[in-house]
């Protein structure tokens, strides 16, 4: 009850205050009074220079993340029914015969190859000593052979026609020169023999005519060189480690 009485009294006081307030009691018939705006000059604040604050680099250790285990996902095999492709019949392609003219290949002259003689030094083989083998004499008794009497057989003379033998061509055999090491012979002293001077008449040699040799031009076909394929060289990317540059302050500390 006391609370209700206090609430009612407070409400009455509030209503009285609102009614008796000067805004409610103001006379609205009077025009408003003009008040010019008051100019407030701006206040000058000099700029404050703050020296740069040096913040050392913060070391952040690398965070190691454990590997995440992903169980294998089972994918059932997808059944693809076989696709029937009917056979394609291609008509035979007629290729007319290509005429290739005969290629003229001139004879290639191969000069004879001269091989120098191969020198093989004599190989020294020491004599092998073989001791004499003793063989006892074998006794053979004499065999008696009675004399055989053969009557003379008459052989008529046989006529043999002369056999024609064509000449056999034997190619010249080239024997490589045999190397004979020089044999040292001591000088033999021979007394000088006097030979009277012999006068030989001059021998006339007629000039020999050598006809000019005509050599046919040698045809050298152009040599085709196929292009050489050079596979691309793989150069792995070069990874340069990051260069750590410590942060420098914009102004040296203590300059202000």
Swiss-Prot record:
Domain of life: Eukaryota
One Gene Ontology molecular-function label: structural constituent of cell wall
Signal peptide: 1-26
Record localization: Secreted, Cell wall
Database matches in InterPro entries: Adhesive_plaq, Extensin-like, Proline-rich_CW_protein
Keyword terms of this UniProt record: Cell wall, Developmental protein, Repeat, Secreted, Signal
Residue stretches of each Sequence repeat: 31-35, 36-40, 41-45, 46-50, 51-55, 56-60, 61-65, 66-70, 71-75, 76-80, 81-85, 86-90, 91-95, 96-100, 101-105, 106-110, 111-115, 116-120, 121-125, 126-130, 131-135, 136-140, 141-145, 146-150, 151-155, 156-160, 161-165, 166-170, 171-175, 176-180, 181-185, 186-190, 191-195, 196-200, 201-205, 206-210, 211-215, 216-220, 221-225, 226-230, 231-235, 236-240, 241-245, 246-250
Region annotated Disordered, chain positions: 233-256
GO annotation, cellular component aspect: extracellular region
Region feature 44 X 5 AA tandem repeats of P-P-[VIY]-[EYKP]-[KT], mapped onto this chain: 31-250
Record-stated family: Belongs to the plant proline-rich protein superfamily. ENOD12 family.
Known function: This is a developmentally regulated putative cell wall protein.
Protein name: Repetitive proline-rich cell wall protein 1
């Amino acid at each position: 009850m006391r609370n209700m009485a206090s609430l009612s009294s407070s409400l009455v006081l509030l209503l009285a205050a609102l009614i008796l307030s000067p805004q409610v009691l103001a006379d609205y018939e009077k025009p408003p009074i003009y008040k010019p705006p008051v100019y407030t000059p701006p206040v000058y604040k000099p700029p404050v220079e703050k020296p740069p604050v040096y913040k050392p680099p913060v070391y952040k250790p690398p965070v190691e993340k454990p590997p995440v285990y992903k169980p294998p996902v089972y994918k059932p095999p997808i059944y693809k029914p076989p696709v029937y492709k009917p056979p394609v019949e291609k008509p035979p392609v007629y290729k007319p015969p290509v005429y290739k003219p005969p290629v003229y290949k001139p004879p290639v002259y191969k000069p004879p190859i001269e091989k120098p003689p191969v020198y093989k030094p004599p190989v020294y083989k020491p004599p092998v000593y073989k001791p004499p083998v003793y063989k006892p004499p074998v006794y053979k008794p004499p065999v008696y052979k009675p004399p055989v009497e053969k009557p003379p057989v008459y052989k008529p003379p046989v006529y043999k026609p002369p056999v024609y033998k064509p000449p056999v061509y034997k190619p010249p055999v080239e024997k490589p020169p045999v190397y004979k090491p020089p044999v040292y012979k001591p000088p033999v002293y021979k007394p000088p023999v006097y030979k009277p001077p012999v006068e030989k008449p001059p021998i006339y040699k007629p000039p020999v005519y050598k006809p000019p040799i005509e050599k046919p031009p040698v045809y050298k076909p152009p040599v085709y060189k196929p292009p050489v394929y050079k596979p691309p060289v793989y150069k792995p990317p070069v990874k340069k480690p990051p260069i750590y540059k410590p942060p420098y302050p914009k102004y040296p500390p203590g300059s202000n």
